[in-house]
Amino acid sequence: MNPSKRREKAKNRKESGRFAQLPHVVLNSPDYVGLSYKSKALLVDLVHQYNGKNNGDLTAALGTLKARGWKRSATLTNAVKELMKAHLIIRTREGKFQNPHSRCALYAMTWRKIDECEDKDLEIRPTATAPRKFSLEKQSKHPLLKA
């Protein structure tokens, strides 16, 4: 019996498929809470691209995100800048626009380790741990974080 069927039988439930994971420690951080709605929406769309092994290969290119409702590259650029300033994402590859070798910038979520992304020419090496460790940060001053 395959693992999916075993789980369904053991837990009496079906597999739910892929999901986008945003940990509470990130959602409750002052950096996230202080974001504009557009930056929060972009973060969700970047997390949506994550498949468990491609952190570092997430794109904010308009061509990719048009299907998710984005209309202006300037809006995306501003949201990316805000997410980077808040240290919620980092750029793993600089975009360049030279014919015929154009390529988009790539990003990684800071609360997950950066993965090996073959053939992506990342400028940041894969990591064993997340670049940012939210659980170790002092966050007691923020009202949403008090127990």
Where is each model-derived feature located?
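Positively charged, structured surface patches that bind polyanionic biopolymers
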Residues: 1-36, 121-135, 146
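A generic short-segment signal for beta-strand/edge and adjacent turn/coil regions
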Residues: 10-14, 26-29, 45, 59-60, ...
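A short linear-motif detector with a strong N-terminal bias
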Residues: 12-13, 20-23, 36-39, 67-69, ...
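Short alpha-helical "packing" element that flanks the helix-turn-helix/winged-helix DNA-binding module
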Residues: 39-46
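Winged helix-turn-helix DNA-binding recognition segment
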Residues: 49-108, 112-113
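Short, amphipathic alpha-helical interaction segments positioned at domain boundaries
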Residues: 105-139
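Intrinsically disordered, low-complexity terminal/linker regions enriched in Pro/Ser/Gly
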Residues: 141-147
